[in-house]
Amino acid sequence: MEKSAIRMIAQMISLNRIEVLFLKQYYGGYSPKFYLRDMSNNSLKEIKIADKYEDDRFIHYYFNEIEIDFCRVYQIVDAYGLSETLQYSKLVYDEDFLNMNYYDGDDLGNNYHMEYTEFKVWTPTALEVKVLITKNDTTCSSNMKRLDKGVFYAKIEGDYDNCRYVYLVRHHDEYCFTVDPYAYSSSSNSQSSIIINLDKT
């Protein structure tokens, strides 16, 4: 979205605190109420404004003690019906969030079996992750499930030895392709990761 078109930005800035930037040119930067929408069940609840301040362009609204399940996607809705996806990206600067999502497991990456392959990637600020596997020039996409500690997981049935894969990661309303930082091997151009049968090595 172009900056000129942005009317509202919604972001978690700590574990239980939300910041909403409301464009002054949109209703004078004023909304008497805001709501939190849980996209898993479309439920809507009002959240109370704790404090606010303004800069040259935006009114900044703050909301405290907001309980968020990071396995879900949320929207902030203003009093006029405008909705905006709640971003988690700024939580990389929050020590409490990073401590809560600290993961020291040794099972990240791909784990090959002849009948299936498991995928695990640590990306705690992502809203959604898909794994895209290419076999015989055909690419299939599968949603990954968010587990504890910011780990996303998928188990894909079938034999995918030596197949290429990438992750499609969603932050806010944008998606980006990324290789697996925990993979044992990657393609020659480093554009994709490779599933490896370690029993052959």
What name fits each language-model region?
Residues 2-13, 25-39:
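Short, basic/aromatic recognition patches that contact phosphate-bearing ligands
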Residues 32-68:
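Acidic, low-complexity Ser/Thr/Gly/Pro-rich repeat segments typical of extracellular/periplasmic
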Residues 27-43, 128-134, 139:
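Short, surface-exposed alpha-helix to beta-strand junction/turn motifs within ectodomains of secreted
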Residues 122-126, 136, 147:
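A short, compositionally biased micro-patch
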Residues 2-10, 53-118, 139-141, 147-201:
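The feature marks proteins involved in alpha-glucan
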Residues 16-20, 115-119:
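Structural beta-strand segments of beta-rich domains
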Residues 37-39, 77, 122, 132-134, ...:
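A generic structural motif
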Residues 22-31, 122-129, 160:
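Short proline/glycine-enriched turn/loop motifs at strand-loop junctions of beta-rich domains
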